[in-house]
């Protein structure tokens, strides 16, 4: 149960932060966000904000989505011949269109649709009250709403508030905002993980950190913050020098020369033996030195962010030199990592979230249609050509990209199931 909760929290936060980036910059650009959903699947709660956006909570707590007016996935559910009802305002304009059987409007007028335009001309024409001898045309208010089949009430999407009506620079920024939010979140989480761990491990010093009570080092008199100058007359400059000698000498007395408060002391430490992957190594019970000052912690967050980015790009590069599904991971791998992280502690969960956030941001910027990177490429092509690609061609390109992503996800998920459960 702990693993499931961890997975839901991790996945949910990453996706919602990503979608909020699109949401915020769409709003700034004057693009109508028809719905901001938390979760997926059937709606369990909805609230229409004064900003024109409907905020919903859906049954499955896995991520969420943003519906921007005029985007490919935002389709009008009205078709000629459809029975529906309309609600009028005081001047006779339609302010509400009900296509749902789940919702009843007490003052609505039933009609069968003949024709409509909710983008440019803003009208709806049909037979009212079953009278097929007379066609009635109603003007539709610019801010009218439509109640969809599942009962969700959203604003109609006139052309002037659609995605394509915004400036090209605003559309590029709106597409980029999701990955950008993931990068910002990644840095914040990496920095938070450093704070939760107490600081940044410094492996380039001969100064030691925490000494485990009752361990060989503690019993020999070694103390936290001691500087180990030499072991058996071999100079120690960094933590790796220290561990190399200790691991090679299980149950053998070692002469340590340490500096403490400006004075040198000589101690005899006997590493205890420990089995690690069929090898016997020495351990003395000492952790690396940790920098705990604020600048070091902030720099640690930056360094972890840069290291993560480098690792992701190296992994992506390796796909072109030797492609293997084992180099990719989907929801199943994410669940497995969540299980391991939840057992390791809060700081490990935070670090995992940071890694996954950076992954999500970078993967979404790949120039694949249906991903944010693919949309940005289409925006750039529009800027070069001076006009957008036709909606038909863009739809085909997006469909191909979506199909590619879906096939890859199925293969990766199946491969993960085989790896972890069989």
Swiss-Prot record:
Domain PDZ: 179-273
Membrane spanning stretches: 176-196, 349-369, 394-414
Topology class, membrane: Multi-pass membrane protein
CC cofactor: Zn(2+)
GO CC terms in record: plasma membrane
GO BP: any one term: proteolysis
UniProt xrefs under Pfam families: PDZ_6, Peptidase_M50
Active-site residue numbers: 19
MF GO annotations: metal ion binding; metalloendopeptidase activity
Alphabetized UniProt keyword annotations: Cell membrane, Hydrolase, Membrane, Metal-binding, Metalloprotease, Protease, Transmembrane, Transmembrane helix, Zinc
Enzyme Commission no: 3.4.24.-
Amino acids binding Zn(2+): 18, 22
Listed CDD domains: cpPDZ_EcRseP-like (cd23081), S2P-M50_PDZ_RseP-like (cd06163)
InterPro entries named in the record: PDZ, PDZ_6, PDZ_sf, Pept_M50_Zn, Peptidase_M50
Localisation: Cell membrane
Keyword Repeat: no
Family, per entry: Belongs to the peptidase M50B family.
Function: Involved in production of the peptide pheromone cAD1.
Name of this chain's protein: Probable protease eep
Native organism taxonomy: Bacteria, Bacillati, Bacillota, Bacilli, Lactobacillales
């Amino acid at each position: 149960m702990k693993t499931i909760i961890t997975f839901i929290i991790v996945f949910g936060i990453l996706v919602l932060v990503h979608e909020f980036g699109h949401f915020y910059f769409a709003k700034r650009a004057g693009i109508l966000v028809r719905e901001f959903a938390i979760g997926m699947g059937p709606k369990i709660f909805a609230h229409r904000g004064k900003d024109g956006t409907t905020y919903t909570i859906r049954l499955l707590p896995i991520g969420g989505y943003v519906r921007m007016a005029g985007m490919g996935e935002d389709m009008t559910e009205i078709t000629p011949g459809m029975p529906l009802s309309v609600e009028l305002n005081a001047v006779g304009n339609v302010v509400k269109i009900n296509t749902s059987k789940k919702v009843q409007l007490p003052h609505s007028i039933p009609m069968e649709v003949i024709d409509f335009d909710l983008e440019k001309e803003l009208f709806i024409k049909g037979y009212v009250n079953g009278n097929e001898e007379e066609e009635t045309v109603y003007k539709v208010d610019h801010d009218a709403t439509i109640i969809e089949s599942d009962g969700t009430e959203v604003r109609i999407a006139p052309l002037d508030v659609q995605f394509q009506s915004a400036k090209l620079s605003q559309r590029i920024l709106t597409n980029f905002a999701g990955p950008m939010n993931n990068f910002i979140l990644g840095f914040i989480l990496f920095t938070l993980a450093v704070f939760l761990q107490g600081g940044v491990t410094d492996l380039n010093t001969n100064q030691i950190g925490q000494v485990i009570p009752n361990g060989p080092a503690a019993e020999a008199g070694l103390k936290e913050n001691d500087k180990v100058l030499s072991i058996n007359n071999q100079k120690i400059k960094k933590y790796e020098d220290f561990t190399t000698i200790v691991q090679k000498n299980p149950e053998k007395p070692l002469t340590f020369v340490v500096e403490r408060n400006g004075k040198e002391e000589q101690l005899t430490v006997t590493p205890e033996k420990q089995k690690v992957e069929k090898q016997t190594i020495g351990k003395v019970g000492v952790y690396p030195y940790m920098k705990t000052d604020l600048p070091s912690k902030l720099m640690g967050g930056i360094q972890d962010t840069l290291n993560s980015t480098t690792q992701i790009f190296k992994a992506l590069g390796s796909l072109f030199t030797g492609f293997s599904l084992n180099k990719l991971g989907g929801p199943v791998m994410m669940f497995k990592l969540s299980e391991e992280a939840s057992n390791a502690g809060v700081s490990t969960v935070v670090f995992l979230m940071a890694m996954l956030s950076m992954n999500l941001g970078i993967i979404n910027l790949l120039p694949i249609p249906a991903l944010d990177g693919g949309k940005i490429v289409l925006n750039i092509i529009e800027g070069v050509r001076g006009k957008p690609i036709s909606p038909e061609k863009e739809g085909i390109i997006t469909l191909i990209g979506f199909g590619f992503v879906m096939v890859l996800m199925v293969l990766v998920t199946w491969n993960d199931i085989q790896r972890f459960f069989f």
